[in-house]
Every structure is written in C-alpha cells, then in structure tokens.
C-alpha cells in the first residue's frame, strides 16, 4: 500500500498544506470489499500522536466496534520513512512520530454490511458511513480538513452533503470535499457509484436525491411528494430551514432497514418495490428522517453533541428525539394531504394500542427505555417484550398527548409546533447547545405556564396509563376503552421446518406458569400431533381453568407439561371524533 499511494499522497499533502487533516479514500478492488484510507496529519506537536476510530454511529445507539474492520495500519513521515505504530486500546493506534512534521497514516477498512449505519463496497457501488471509515486525531476533533475520493474506474457519481473544496486534485475523476471539524465529517455519508440523481428546491433549500438500486419509483412523482413533505416540515418551524442544501441517499434493496439522520442529509434503506402499495410508508420514512434535521440534530439533549465517539452517550430523552419525530412522521402526512383525518386516527389508534397493550409498557418507563437503548433497545432478547417499551412508539403517544394539552390550553391557536419552535430558538439559536432533562421540563412548563410534574412522574418516569379520553376529548376525539378479558394460552408460535416452535412467552401467562420456554418444540397436545395453527385452534377452544398436556422437546430431551388456561386482558382503545371542539380538532388535523 505504501509505494505509489505514498508518492501521490505526499504530493497532495503539499497542495493542501493549509489544511490540518486530509483523507484520501480509494477503492481499487471493490470485489474485495476494502476501502483504502490515507489520513494525512499536519500542524501537530512533535512526538507521539494517537488516531482513533469511533465505536458507534450517532443516531444509532449501539457500540458497533467499527475498529474490528480496520486492517494493515501503517504510518510514514513526510520523507516516506515508516514510523512505529502500536495499538493502545480497541479503537486507538499510537504513532511514534518523533520529529516528523507531517504524518501519513494508512489503513484498510472492510466494508460489506449495507445498512444506513454501516459501510459497503462491491462492484455495484460504495457506501461510506463515515463513523466507521475515518479515524480522527485524538484531542483534535476540532481540526478542519478535506477528503479526496478516488472512485473505482466504473463508478461515475459521488454524492455527499459535504461541500466541494476550493482546491481539487489534478487526478481525473477524483473529487475533494471540505469539512470544518470531525463532527461534520462523521455526520456526512458518501454514495459512490452510478446512482440516479435528481433534485428539487423548497423555500430556497436545494434537495439532492441519490437513488441506488433499481425499483418501481417514479422520479417526477417523488419530486412532487417529497417537496410537499419538506414544505409541511418547514411550516412546523415557521417556514425556516437551517440548511441551504440537503441530501437524500436512498438504497433500494430487497430488505429495507429504515433510515439514519444527519444534520443536512439522511440515508434511507427501503424495499425496492415500496413505491407501490407501501408508498405512504416511504413518505412517512422521509418525513421522519427529515424532521430529525431539527429534532435531534439541532434540538437535542446536551449529551448528543458534541459527541464522545469512544463510548456510549447516555440520555433519557430519546422519547422526545425519536418519539416526537415518530408522532410527526404520520401527522405530517395529514398536513401534506396523504392521509385523511379518519386514516390518521386509525394510525394513531394502532400506535396507542401497541403501546398500552405491551406487557413491557407496565415495566419500563420511557425515560429508562431511552437511557437503556444501548443495552436493551438495540440488544433485544426473547424476554424483551415482557420488560421493555420502545421510546419510538411510547414517545409518539406522549407527543400526541402534549399536542392535545397545548391545543386545549391555547384554545386552538398553538400546538406542539410552537413548543418545538421555542426549543429551537432558546437552545439552538440563542445558546447553540443541547438541554438537560431538567431544562427540558422547565422549558415545557414555561411554555405552558403550568406545572408538569404529574406528566413526568406518571408517564415519563412512571408507567401509568393516562386518561386519554379526558385529554383527547378536549380536542374533539373520543377515546373508548375496548379491552376485554379472554382465555389465553400466552405463547406465540412459529412453524420451522414442519415443527411447532415457541418464539415468545408472555410474563404471567398460562404458558409461563406451566414452564414453557422460548425455543421449545411442541410435539403434541393431549396426545395429538400438532403444528402451530392446530395448537392455537385447540387451546383456543379451552375455557378458563381447563388444562391440556403438552409434549415438548428441549435440548433434545422430551418433557411433559400441564397447562392450565387463565384469563388475560390486553388494554385497547378506540379513537373517533366525538363531535365537540370542532375548531380544535380541525386545527390539530389541518392540511397545508
């Protein structure tokens, strides 16, 4: 890797000497799935220096150990002499620079996991999730710099939200981009290949859309619909958008995996056929990730920027960051004209019933769910449904709850939009920082002019079910409880190779009491061979207190269990207009 790369890099380093950090990114053999990275460092104190690879990607709250993909780390001085490199921790390398004035660190990154948060390279395209590709100089994340991308010979297009540098290399087809600090670089993905690119402009912000992969999308339709979503979102914040340019990178693949937000871009991963029957889901995803350019990238907990890339960054406010965003990603489709009011109420009802019908909702407060995202939310196990509650859905319901409180408080003249504007102005515009948990509550109380301890004690730090009818009834929505106690087995089943397998056991259920566990194979019930549908039908005909005998296989041992059927009531609600407070109802579900 040294020879030709080193000669070119030393020449380029001289050309960009005004910059303190420069990266060269190559992909000479994409079939091997390796990005070749050079990190050129200048203007540092003589002696040792340390470079580090982040262990996580902001917006995805899991330590992913990106350094596991790094190989062949080498370093050279400005004369081409090799310097000693030693690893000092799982994600750090110390370079013995001595009296060197410039250091060129070279390494390879294996990239063969295509997701919105991990990098990928093959003969069809390259995707760079920057947190897992670019190292930083320890103690100097504030250094500005440039990145030069040298595409594989068959790749014609480079898409990134980074600005082009004023000085470019002379090598054909390469492009150089600039960044003010490492936080901006790591927040800027790259799509490199032959993606289809189009653009549209809304309120003076240019939006570039890069579509990788074939699909049943219609560009003319996307331009119109994505622009309407963007317009609706700008209106939430008084028509103001902090970006002059914004980039969508869309991966159209077999198995779509959601999205990841960045300050002036997003990466979306969707099923390539989603633009048919699942088109509104795609628009909801667009709305969700775009909303993050305000909520989480600028309106944010103080822990979420500037980041510590070496370890977890804990906050108990993800229910606001992701939850409020989830609330808006469907509400905005009403405002943009893609959902009717009735359709939206059915959507909100579904979210409400998912939340309150979850066993884990009575166990894990949403503040704890936020804080434990690193160890529970992103690392679920077979018991997670019994003990955890997603901050996405619970936060969305709490967002709707607060929206109703605000609309009622101000008699249909203000809503959650105005509180979001208030947070943006008070913390991002005036202070340019995030807020603490106490500051968030204080801001809400100041905005509303009332104490909100009950809300945080009961619903954020507690697990109580709110009186939804009382709150939503004031904005014209009746909430009727529809939960009923039924005889329940309490285990979810799947068919695997003809075998009836247990994939979930509800806490406190008849199945759990009998000793049934996830992973058990159910061979027969009351001496009758069954598959999963037959078993569900059989136990569904039993009454409270009646029993059945299960023959199961566990770890290749045969066991017999007796199940005594019990009652279970899953909370459920129905939402429908109640005919009152029509002005507030119409204000809530207004269109642009």
Residue ranges and their predicted role:
Residues 19-56:
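Early extracytoplasmic/domain-onset interaction patches
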Residues 39, 196-318, 324, 328:
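Juxtacatalytic substrate-recognition/specificity segment
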Residues 329, 339-592:
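C-terminal recognition in membrane/secretory proteostasis and scaffolding
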